[in-house]
Amino acid sequence: MIEIRETSSGVSFAVRLQPKAKKTAIIGELNGALKLGVTDPPIDGRANEALIRFVAGLLKVTRSSVTIAAGESSRNKVIRIEGVTAEQVRFRLKVW
């Protein structure tokens, strides 16, 4: 199960990113983190930008409300999303 932490302005959760995947999609769950694949390579922040776009679309929030709180240059990241609750995130991840 993915660990989603409530913050004062939204939520945060761990992501394990797989750059250069065959398609941009949810791959599954790995050690409490959401495992995602993006087709972009990890060059010049392209994989990070693809991750932000994908998560924003998945959770139906603006791109500006999604930030990488930790792990800019790592496959293991912490994503922060403003303006949503943990319950909303869980619901939208189940629908996907």
Swiss-Prot record:
InterPro entries: DUF167, YggU-like_sf. Signal peptide: none annotated. SMART domains: DUF167. One of its GO terms (cellular component) is cytoplasm. Pfam families: DUF167 (PF02594). HAMAP family: UPF0235. Belongs to the UPF0235 family. This is UPF0235 protein Acid345_4205. It comes from Koribacter versatilis (strain Ellin345).
